[in-house]
């Protein structure tokens, strides 16, 4: 029996095959916005997340335009949009809608295993692509990272443990994302940020913390560890006061 990640990657292979049958990439270039620049100060990457395998439906019928406008108004440095349909109930249409509404950097959050997905994300308006080390071979990761650069985009290379971190460091990527969630079990452990953050601080690499960030205390924890930003989905999608969450992120340490 495979892990949750195995099931997701198997589904992505089917989606990629379908894309090659139905989608022709657009050749024209466009301007992009920089997450690296946004991370010059502590930044919240605020996520549009309808559902997840671990939580089920979170905010299934969210008005993407309204949510993105709220995020930007509250001071988000970037917006992340889940585009996976099968497991997270997102879509490239959600990404395109966010692009129409937002002037800040936009992250395509998906399980990218092929260049054609990057083409699709680019056309929908993404500025940043998530590349998950756990979902890719070293060779494929390097190939996709090079393609992200070729398209004029930035990448967040996501890791969960020491082994994945060493693979990511070899790329010297724009940004490394420490995912506190184990994608094989979907369990969350915020201490991963502190553990892996030490190594990234030694390397003087730009990094953010992802998953399991719900409170002011969590923000203080990741700031102290050296993170330059946080990617937050569920906490914002279920919050009765998004503004308060952003105010908490301004805490000095």
Curated annotation (Swiss-Prot):
The keyword Amino-acid biosynthesis applies. Transmembrane segments: none annotated. Its EC number is 4.1.1.48. It catalyses: 1-(2-carboxyphenylamino)-1-deoxy-D-ribulose 5-phosphate + H(+) = (1S,2R)-1-C-(indol-3-yl)glycerol 3-phosphate + CO2 + H2O. GO terms for biological process: L-tryptophan biosynthetic process. Keywords: Amino-acid biosynthesis, Aromatic amino acid biosynthesis, Decarboxylase, Lyase, Tryptophan biosynthesis. Pathway: Amino-acid biosynthesis; L-tryptophan biosynthesis; L-tryptophan from chorismate: step 4/5. Signal peptide: none annotated. Disulfide bonds: none annotated. CDD domains: IGPS. One of its GO terms (molecular function) is indole-3-glycerol-phosphate synthase activity. Belongs to the TrpC family. HAMAP family: IGPS_B. This is Indole-3-glycerol phosphate synthase. It comes from Bacillus thuringiensis (strain Al Hakam). The lineage of its organism: Bacteria, Bacillati, Bacillota, Bacilli, Bacillales. The gene is trpC.
């Amino acid at each position: 029996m495979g892990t949750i990640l195995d099931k997701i990657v198997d589904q992505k292979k089917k989606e990629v095959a379908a894309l090659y049958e139905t989608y022709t990439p657009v050749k024209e270039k466009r301007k992009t916005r920089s997450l690296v620049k946004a991370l010059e100060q502590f930044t919240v990457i605020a996520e549009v997340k309808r559902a997840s395998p671990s939580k089920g439906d979170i905010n299934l019928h969210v008005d993407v335009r309204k949510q993105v406008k709220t995020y930007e108004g509250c001071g988000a440095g970037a917006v992340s949009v889940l585009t996976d349909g099968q497991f997270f109930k997102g879509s490239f249409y959600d990404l395109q809608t966010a692009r129409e509404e937002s002037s800040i950097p936009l992250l395509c959050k998906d399980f990218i295993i092929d260049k054609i997905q990057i083409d699709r994300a680019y056309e929908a308006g993404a500025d940043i692509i998530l590349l998950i080390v756990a979902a890719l071979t070293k060779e494929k990761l390097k190939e996709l990272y090079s393609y992200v650069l070729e398209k004029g985009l930035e990448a967040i290379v996501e890791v969960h443990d020491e082994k994945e971190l060493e693979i990511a460091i070899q790329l010297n990527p724009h940004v490394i994302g420490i995912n506190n969630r184990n994608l094989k079990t979907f369990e969350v452990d915020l201490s991963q940020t502190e553990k892996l953050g030490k190594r990234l601080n030694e390397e003087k690499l730009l990094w953010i913390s992802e998953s399991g960030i719900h409170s002011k205390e969590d923000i203080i924890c990741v700031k102290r560890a050296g993170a330059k930003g946080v990617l937050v989905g569920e906490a914002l999608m279920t919050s009765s006061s998004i503004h308060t969450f952003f105010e908490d992120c301004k805490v000095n340490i």
